[in-house]
Swiss-Prot record:
GO terms for biological process: translation. SUPFAM superfamilies: L28p-like (SSF143800). GO terms for cellular component: ribonucleoprotein complex; ribosome. The keyword Electron transport does not apply. NCBIfam families: L31, PRK01678.1. InterPro entries: Ribosomal_bL28/bL31-like_sf (IPR034704), Ribosomal_bL31 (IPR002150), Ribosomal_bL31_B (IPR027493), Ribosomal_bL31_sf (IPR042105). This is Large ribosomal subunit protein bL31B. One of its GO terms (molecular function) is structural constituent of ribosome. It comes from Pseudomonas syringae pv. syringae (strain B728a).
Length: 93
């Protein structure tokens, strides 16, 4: 293997700005920013918009209103579909 071609693997401080959560993770990400962690050590710093601490899939706070809206729209659109056939059958008898 060629020397000095691989990125440096190190501990990096990731900050989820939406949930204000910090994660120390081993990574090869290239960043010039550093920040001091609560343990007193200064680590390379990367800000994240979304992580497992703030993503609705992982937090269990999924937006069910969108799904309920789709179901309500479907039921509203096809509400008369099944009832029209029943009325015609009842009127024919």
């Amino acid at each position: 293997m060629k020397p000095d071609i691989h990125p440096q693997y190190r501990t990096v401080l990731f900050h989820d700005t939406a949930a204000d959560a910090y994660f120390l993770i081993g990574s090869t990400v290239d960043t010039d920013r550093t920040q001091q962690h609560t343990d007193g050590t200064t680590y390379p710093y990367v800000a994240l918009d979304v992580s497992s601490a703030s993503h609705p899939m992982y937090t269990g706070q999924q937006r069910k209103a969108t799904t309920e809206g789709r179901i309500a729209g479907f039921n509203k659109r096809f509400a008369t579909f099944g009832s029209a056939g029943k009325k015609e059958t009842a009127a024919a008898q």
